């Protein structure tokens, strides 16, 4: 076996000299290098922003969605939406471990894992799309994938169904970042708080701010409000369109005694919500953009344009122990687990 670069640069076809994630095309030849792991793929969880874009482009026609996904993988060697630039993650079974990783990894052949690196950099071959579940952004396939030496993963827990674990691990970075960023007594606004990542963030934020803090959940409609109310009765819920910054600002200020918030978290899966996240944040506060629909230039120039001196964290989906933190939420909260079971199983 030949040895490749631990970051996967040996798989890059075009353009030369870049890493796999920004590459336009990578090799999805499934003959592994000595420091790679071959995965027999069970399902892809497409990033929410990516799936939404593909679905809208396809006119919500499932067969056209299938064709678009196959086209992307055939052209790029990976599942990276050319419009959003994002990917998702996968679950599968370890089929083969490269010679250089035997004894160095805790994985063994037959382990079921979820990859915690983006599909936007993961070599992928799709042999067949078995089923698509648009309501949960899931694509069940027959296919193979490669995990690089530097790739992170989680062995699927035995105390919950694999689809439940997959749903949570798909957005593991969001609640784990909340655990790091949010402090006692703070005020926090969460946009898209009734979505998968949003509900987990809301639950974690309530824990972190404690009894003297405040968590404000921004949702689109009464249906989402009812769902978020089930997650926690300690979340102050407001209805506003996240693409309308002034509406969001006024709603958040009204819910927070006319004060700006310490932290705003964006979990929305559509574009043009940057300023709705930035405007409600107080001077020297934090805006965390988990959403892959975030535009860096819109956020940076937008904050500058309104004179906001705030810390902005854009799209950082990984933090240490993020998988453990997120799965623990489902163990702690019977209500969260019940909701996830209803939606994602």
UniProtKB/Swiss-Prot annotation:
Belongs to the KDD family. It is an enzyme of class 1 (oxidoreductase). Transmembrane segments: none annotated. The gene is kdd. InterPro entries: NAD(P)-bd_dom_sf. One of its GO terms (biological process) is L-lysine catabolic process to acetate. Involved in the anaerobic fermentation of lysine. Catalyzes the oxidative deamination of L-erythro-3,5-diaminohexanoate (3,5-DAH) to 3-keto-5-aminohexanoate (KAH). It can use NAD or NADP. Its EC number is 1.4.1.11. Pathway: Amino-acid degradation; L-lysine degradation via acetate pathway. Keywords: NAD, NADP, Oxidoreductase. GO terms for molecular function: L-erythro-3,5-diaminohexanoate dehydrogenase activity. This is L-erythro-3,5-diaminohexanoate dehydrogenase. Homodimer. The lineage of its organism: Bacteria, Fusobacteriati, Fusobacteriota, Fusobacteriia, Fusobacteriales. It catalyses: (3S,5S)-3,5-diaminohexanoate + NAD(+) + H2O = (5S)-5-amino-3-oxohexanoate + NH4(+) + NADH + H(+).
């Amino acid at each position: 076996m030949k040895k490749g670069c631990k970051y996967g640069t040996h798989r890059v076809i075009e353009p030369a000299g870049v890493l796999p994630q920004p590459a336009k095309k990578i090799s999805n030849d499934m003959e592994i290098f000595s420091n790679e792991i071959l995965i027999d793929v069970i399902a892809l969880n497409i990033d929410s922003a990516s799936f939404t874009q593909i679905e809208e482009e396809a006119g919500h026609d499932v067969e056209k969605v299938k064709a678009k996904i196959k086209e992307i993988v055939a052209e790029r060697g990976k599942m990276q939406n050319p419009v959003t630039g994002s990917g998702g993650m996968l679950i599968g079974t370890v089929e083969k471990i490269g010679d250089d990783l035997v004894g160095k990894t805790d994985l063994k052949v037959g382990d079921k894992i979820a990859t915690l690196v983006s599909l936007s950099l993961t070599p992928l071959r799709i042999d067949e799309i078995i089923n698509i579940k648009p309501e949960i952004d899931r694509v069940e396939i027959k296919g193979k994938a490669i995990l690089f030496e530097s790739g992170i993963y989680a062995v699927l827990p035995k105390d919950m169904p694999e689809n439940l674990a997959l749903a949570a691990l798909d957005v593991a970075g969001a609640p784990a970042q909340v655990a790091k960023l949010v402090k006692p007594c703070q005020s926090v606004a969460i946009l898209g708080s009734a979505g998968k990542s949003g509900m987990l963030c809301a639950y974690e934020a309530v824990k972190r701010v404690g009894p003297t803090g405040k968590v404000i959940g921004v949702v689109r409609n009464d249906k989402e409000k009812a769902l978020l109310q089930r997650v926690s009765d300690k979340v102050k819920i407001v209805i506003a369109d996240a693409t309308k910054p002034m509406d969001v600002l006024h709603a958040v200020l009204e819910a927070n005694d006319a004060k700006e918030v310490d932290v705003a978290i964006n979990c929305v899966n559509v574009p043009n919500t940057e300023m709705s996240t930035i405007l409600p944040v107080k001077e020297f506060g934090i805006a965390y953009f988990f959403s892959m629909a975030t535009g860096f230039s819109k956020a940076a120039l937008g904050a500058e344009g309104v004179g906001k001196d705030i810390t902005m964290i854009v799209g950082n989906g990984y933090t240490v122990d993020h998988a453990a933190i997120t799965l623990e939420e489902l163990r702690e909260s019977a209500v969260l687990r019940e909701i996830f079971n209803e939606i994602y199983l």
